[in-house]
Amino acid sequence: MSQILLQPANAMITLENVNKWYGQFHVLKNINLTVQPGERIVLCGPSGSGKSTTIRCINHLEEHQQGRIVVDGIELNEDIRNIERVRQEVGMVFQHFNLFPHLTVLQNCTLAPIWVRKMPKKEAEDLAVHYLERVRIAEHAHKFPGQISGGQQQRVAIARSLCMKPKIMLFDEPTSALDPEMVKEVLDTMIGLAQSGMTMLCVTHEMGFARTVADRVIFMDRGEIVEQAAPDEFFAHPKSERTRAFLSQVIH
């Protein structure tokens, strides 16, 4: 049976004592996190710290073994209907674009609204054009992914997620696979999205983006949340030695 639960202070996302293992490896250790509507969170930390696993658990791409995850009042549990409902409200952009190479940019963006939300084709196309314009790439709507740059493909991936009208956007190192000259165009798109009031969680090493956009920066290491604070406090006065060591490596 579908279950709708109250969350702390009308939170959009709540993780309570979340644990996950890969075999014997304890990848997430008692993660507690509350995200309010419209809040913009940046997760940072060294490779293998559990950042990506944390956000992938939020839309059940990874399954947690202990604890509770509640998204927009819906608990993620074994009920497949709950998982499907959450996924309709959560967009995700990955390191790699995962666009269908045999479909045009426009078709990539209309596929999910037509098949999942049962949207009429014309309405889905109008919506796709709207979001392609928003990410400044509408002129490429009828091209195939292989005909545009990596940065442009990542902006298409963002538009594709927005076409499902999500309440939450998750970004898993969206610029890490891009050439340096393409990073800015994707970050600018994400900054515009953040300014629109979208609830966002972003795993990234782009500390300039974190300073500009985040309401809160969370540092993870060895499967734990080590430290979290507003950007000014986080970067100026990190409390943990582990945080200071990490920042010394990524800020030049």
Curated annotation (Swiss-Prot):
InterPro entries: AAA+_ATPase (IPR003593), ABC_ATPase_HisP-typ (IPR030679), ABC_transporter-like_ATP-bd (IPR003439), ABC_transporter-like_CS (IPR017871), MetN_ABC_transporter-like (IPR050086), P-loop_NTPase (IPR027417). CDD domains: ABC_HisP_GlnQ. Pfam families: ABC_tran. Residues 13-247 form the ABC transporter domain. GO terms for biological process: peptide transport. Its main location: membrane. The keyword Lyase does not apply. GO terms for cellular component: ATP-binding cassette (ABC) transporter complex; ATP-binding cassette (ABC) transporter complex, substrate-binding subunit-containing; membrane. The keyword Magnesium does not apply. It comes from the Bacteria. Keywords: Amino-acid transport, ATP-binding, Cell inner membrane, Cell membrane, Membrane, Nucleotide-binding, Transport. It is a peripheral membrane protein. ATP binds at G45, P46, S47, G48, S49, G50, K51, S52. One of its GO terms (molecular function) is ATP hydrolysis activity. Disulfide bonds: none annotated. Belongs to the ABC transporter superfamily. Probably part of a binding-protein-dependent transport system YdhWXYZ for an amino acid. Probably responsible for energy coupling to the transport system. This is Uncharacterized amino-acid ABC transporter ATP-binding protein YhdZ. It comes from Escherichia coli (strain K12). The lineage of its organism: Bacteria, Pseudomonadati, Pseudomonadota, Gammaproteobacteria, Enterobacterales.
